């Protein structure tokens, strides 16, 4: 999955680059954007900054999801610790209760024993009491062993909980380290945004200077046009200057050819330079047509040269002045071309800086993708570890349930046996009461049977209490096991839903990728078609130019009408150019407003990111406080464990004391039996 995500991200980066190139080509082809090419860099930087800022919210969302998962795990571990505490408390209370029951039973039996007054009782009753005491001692030892086993299991569970807590502490430290890294990355993003703002301001300043130069050049062009109109009237008379103008036009044509070759090498500046060259070519063609007309007029005027020699001398002074003005205009045009070349160099530098920034952004995206992959791998490992732990707990609970069920079956068998013995004793008592009191031996048998009944009832009560406790434990264990199974099922369902959503996202991304590839292929085909059309148009234009030159050489008389029409068209073109300048100014103002809006939106996003950072800081502080609380709870749990160990030691001491008392009681019983036998022998002797 990680490799597929990397491939998809790389393909998205490539597609974004292709779309940017297509947007740039579309801007160059748009006729409304011919004179606003310097603003393209600013638009690209703004779009890049917006794209970079749009890439941050999904990362923050994933980070918040990871924090929510960690919070859920914390709550789950806290609940588990509480359940373990409750289980320990129940074990302690059961141990204390069993100890109190044993103590009460032993004390009652010791109090019930006669120390010298019951000489007339039977020896068989003493033997039965001794057996009962021995059975009770065995039961007490079994319960002691069972309590020790419970204590060992509780200690093992506490050790496992401590291990889980240590693992959680390490994960929390890693999480804090990742938070610091993300803060550093956000600081870097803020610095980059500041740099982009500075670059945008510089670009705006350069655009303002460029607009000023363009307006000045337009003013100079208008002045030059006025001067050219005046020079046209003078050129009709000045025949000698026609050859010099033809040489100048040939030099300009050679320069234009060289410029066309340079423009073919530079793809990014091709369209803007072509348009400027076309404008210059149109002006040169106009000049050539006017020069042809002037040549024709010069041929006509050669016949009247003798008449106008005097006027030529007067006009030579004017021609010299016009030549000086032309030379000044040419120098100004050269200066304007140098300024344009400097502006183009600055644009190239800005584009190089933007490419470097894009490379740095791609590196940042790669680092972020690596961080996301590491977080996903950690989450999977945690889920697998929790699954294994729950499976182990479920197996342990099943084993405990089976053991408790076996104990319950054994205790039910003992109860059934006691009930059968009781019924047999009751039947014997009924028989004895029916037969009546015949001998003292029968009376003794009745007392023995009565004592047996009492012992059976006591054992029955004890076994019933134990059965109830065992059933309660079984119910609690079943409830706990069902809850844990339901939790594990919920976790599995959540994981399955997450996997399905990721698969759907991958399919959707692949579909989008195919669509974008198809669109890119269509765009490439369209660009190739447009290039072919442009080449064909250039060829057609060249053919038309050649045919027009031949037609101009043939149709000399129709140029006067065409001159008038061209003057009208020039006026209309001037009006149109003014309208275009106004439209360009409007578009420039609109671009300024849009840049302001984009900067405001970027600032709003930065402020929102700052607020999210503060919220995340508060969240991390809350997590740290929760970790401190968890540490305090662990310390309290350790104290409770020590207290439970002390209680267990006390219980062991009490059990040892009870065993000693039982041993002393057995000795006393043996002494009493010996005394009773002696007394019985003495009574027999006296009777004899």
Curated annotation (Swiss-Prot):
GO cellular component assignments: centriole; centrosome; ciliary basal body; ciliary transition fiber; clathrin complex; cytosol
Subcellular location: Cytoplasm, Cytoskeleton, Microtubule organizing center, Centrosome, Centriole
Molecular function (Gene Ontology), one example: sodium channel regulator activity
Protein keywords: Acetylation, Coiled coil, Cytoplasm, Cytoskeleton, Phosphoprotein
List of residues that carry N-acetylalanine: 2
Coiled coil feature spans: 59-673
Tissues and organs where the protein is expressed, per its UniProt entry: Detected in small neurons in dorsal root ganglia. Detected in C-type fibers of sciatic nerve (at protein level).
Modified residues (Phosphoserine): 681
One BP annotation, GO: cilium assembly
InterPro entries with a match to the protein in the record: SCLT1
Described function: Adapter protein that links SCN10A to clathrin. Regulates SCN10A channel activity, possibly by promoting channel internalization.
Quaternary structure (record): Interacts with SCN10A and clathrin. Identified in a complex containing SCN10A, clathrin and SCLT1.
PANTHER family assigned to the protein according to its UniProt record, in alphabetical order: SODIUM CHANNEL AND CLATHRIN LINKER 1
The protein, known as: Sodium channel and clathrin linker 1
Provenance organism: Rattus norvegicus
């Amino acid at each position: 999955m990680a490799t597929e995500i990397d491939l998809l991200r790389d393909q998205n980066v490539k597609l974004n680059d292709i779309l940017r190139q297509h947007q740039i080509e579309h801007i160059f082809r748009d006729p409304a954007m011919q004179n606003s090419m310097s603003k393209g860099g600013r638009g690209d930087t703004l779009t890049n900054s917006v794209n970079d800022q749009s890439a941050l919210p999904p990362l923050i969302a994933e980070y918040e999801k990871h924090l929510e998962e960690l919070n859920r795990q914390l709550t789950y571990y806290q609940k588990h610790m509480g359940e373990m505490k409750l289980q320990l408390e129940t074990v302690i209370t059961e141990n204390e209760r069993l100890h109190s029951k044993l103590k009460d039973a032993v004390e009652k039996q010791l109090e019930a024993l006669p120390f010298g007054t019951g000489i007339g009782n039977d020896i068989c009753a003493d033997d039965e009491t001794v057996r009962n005491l021995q059975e009770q001692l065995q039961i007490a030892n079994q319960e002691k062993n069972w309590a020790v086993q419970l204590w060992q299991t509780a200690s093992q569970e506490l050790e496992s909980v401590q291990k889980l807590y240590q693992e959680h502490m390490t994960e929390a430290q890693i999480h804090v380290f990742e938070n610091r890294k993300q803060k550093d990355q956000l600081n870097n993003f803020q610095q980059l945004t500041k740099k982009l703002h500075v670059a945008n301001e510089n670009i705006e300043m350069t655009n303002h200077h460029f607009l000023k130069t363009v307006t000045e050049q337009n003013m100079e062009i208008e002045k030059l046009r006025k001067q050219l109109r005046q020079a046209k009237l003078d050129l009709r008379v000045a025949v000698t200057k026609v050859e010099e103008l033809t040489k100048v036009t040939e030099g300009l044509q050679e320069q234009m050819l060289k410029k066309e070759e340079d423009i073919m090498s530079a793809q990014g500046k091709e369209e803007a330079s072509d348009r400027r060259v076309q404008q210059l070519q149109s002006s040169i063609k106009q000049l050539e047509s006017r020069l042809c007309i002037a040549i024709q007029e010069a041929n006509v005027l050669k016949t009247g040269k003798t008449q106008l020699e005097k006027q030529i001398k007067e006009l030579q002074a004017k021609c010299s002045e016009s030549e000086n003005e032309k030379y000044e205009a040419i120098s100004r045009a050269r200066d304007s071309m140098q300024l344009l070349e400097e502006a183009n160099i600055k644009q190239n530098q800005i584009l190089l800086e933007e490419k470097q920034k894009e490379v740095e952004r791609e590196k940042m995206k790669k680092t972020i993708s690596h961080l996301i992959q590491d977080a996903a791998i950690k989450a999977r490992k945690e889920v697998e570890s929790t699954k294994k732990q729950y499976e182990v707990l479920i197996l342990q609970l099943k084993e405990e349930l089976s053991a408790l069920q076996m104990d319950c079956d054994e205790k039910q068998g003992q109860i059934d046996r006691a009930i059968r013995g009781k019924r047999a004793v009751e039947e014997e008592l009924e028989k004895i009461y029916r037969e009546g009191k015949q001998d003292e031996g029968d009376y003794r048998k009745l007392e023995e049977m009565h004592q047996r009944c009492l012992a059976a009832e006591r054992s029955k009560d004890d076994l019933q209490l134990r059965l109830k406790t065992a059933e309660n434990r079984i119910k609690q264990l079943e409830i706990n096991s069902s809850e844990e199974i339901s939790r594990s099922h919920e976790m599995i369902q959540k994981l399955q839903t997450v996997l399905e959503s990721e698969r759907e996202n991958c399919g959707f991304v692949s579909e989008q990728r195919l669509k974008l590839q198809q669109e890119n292929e269509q765009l490439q085909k369209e660009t190739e078609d447009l290039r072919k059309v442009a080449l064909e148009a250039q060829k057609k234009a060249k053919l038309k130019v050649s045919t027009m030159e031949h037609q101009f050489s043939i149709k000399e008389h129709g140029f006067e009408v065409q001159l008038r029409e061209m003057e009208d068209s020039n006026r209309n073109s001037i009006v149109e150019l003014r309208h275009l300048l106004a439209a360009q100014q409007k578009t420039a103002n609109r671009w300024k407003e849009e840049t302001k809006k984009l900067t405001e939106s970027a600032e709003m996003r930065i402020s929102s990111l700052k607020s999210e950072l503060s919220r995340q800081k508060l969240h991390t502080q809350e997590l740290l406080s929760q970790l401190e609380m968890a540490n305090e709870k662990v310390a309290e749990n350790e104290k409770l464990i020590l207290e439970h160990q002390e209680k267990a030691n006390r219980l062991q001491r009490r059990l040892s004391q009870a065993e000693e008392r039982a041993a002393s009681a057995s000795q006393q019983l043996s002494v009493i039996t010996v005394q009773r036998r002696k007394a019985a022998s003495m009574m027999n002797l006296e009777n004899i």
